Amino acid sequence: VTEPACRVDIVFAPGVVAHRGTAEELVGRALDARSLTGELTFAADTAGLERAVRSAARRGEFVVVPGAGASFTAPAGGAIRVDFGECEADRSAGARVHIRGRGLDGLRYAVDSWYHHRFHPGRIVRYGDHPDQRVELRIPDGDGPFPVVVLIHGGFWRPRWESDLMDALAVDLTARGYVTWNVEYRRGGENRWATIASDVADAVQAVATVPSADPERLVILGHSAGAQLALRAAADATAEEAAVRPALAVSLAGVLNLRLAGERHLGEGAVADAVGSDWAGDRATYERSSPIARLPLGIPQLVVCAVDDEPDMLEMSREYHEAAAATPDDVVRIEGPGDHFTVVDPESEIWRRTAEAIDARIRPRTTPTPPPAARPRPGRGADPRTSRPSS
């Protein structure tokens, strides 16, 4: 891989960072983690920003921090936009991804997004008319049909967290021989609880449109709040005898008991915010939505959690496993060292064990499991010392 192919251009508008050195340090760590180089341009004025954006665009996809409400000109899908504060999504043609509301750490997520798109690109598939009703599809090399993994991201159902959180696992699973279907869904604002659930259900059914995917060998996998959505979707698809039904459901550090999570005000009240009520005010919705209340699901499950996760998260995984084990469901618990995000780190020991357990369930014993393909310019991924989303 040539040096220019590994260089990320990052352009800052005047005044968007409070301390330039801190931004440089954060970006430097993110680049080092991916074995990339970068050129940072801090524009002195609007004209300088426009020149820097034009220059960066000539070299390919770039990162731009234009400032809240500002616009910029870039080729279609040619930029990763970062806004440190909360704001409306940029739906303009020039922005492939808009990372917003994640603070200065949004720069790290932007570098990771650049890396995955540059070296392991997927294809966007729409399953609805809304911009958030989309998935990123990756297909392994070779002849299909392949088993498929549907990935559901977490982030406590809030709009600032998107499917880029699952890019690293999608890349790893594709290298292991799985079609990956990395789901985005509508969140927050006018998009209430029923909308979220219906989007995930529709995305799962849309797997049937992928010729190289084998829907009989479908895994639905969710992280944190995404695990709640994944297991609820699995329960619904099984109960309703949907055309596409998961063969395995995987919870990675999942929010598996909505009543408990709500009563403990996890994620600063995220459950009540998303559902639109507390448990006492809408017990029926909580019962339909909470994975532990849906047992038995009727399909095999893996329940994964790192032992240094937040105590509430670890407790929910253990509680769920114990409850599931008392039903006819086939359920396995996997624990190991790490925190809430170790379970979505492809380099971690607990993810290796999880991937092996998925293989054991989904692949015929006569079919050898391919090792993950060599990755250009490999890196360990996100710096665990930097901030992360909550669930």
Regions found by a protein language model. Name each.
Residues 2-12, 50-57, 62-63, 318-321, ...:
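C-terminal catalytic histidine-bearing segment of alpha/beta-hydrolase fold enzymes
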Residues 9-22, 141-172:
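Short, surface-exposed "cap/lid" segments of acyl-processing enzymes
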Residues 20, 25-46, 84-143:
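N-terminal cap/lid segment of alpha/beta-hydrolase-fold proteins
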Residues 29-30, 269-278, 306-331:
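Active-site-adjacent alpha-helix of alpha/beta-hydrolase-fold enzymes
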Residues 161-170, 181-217:
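Catalytic nucleophile-loop/oxyanion-hole region of alpha/beta-hydrolase
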Residues 222-232:
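Glycine-rich nucleophile elbow surrounding the catalytic serine of serine-hydrolase chemistry
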Residues 231-284:
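Hydrolase active-site cap/lid region
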Residues 260-263, 278-315:
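The feature captures the conserved acid-bearing segment of alpha/beta-hydrolase catalytic domains
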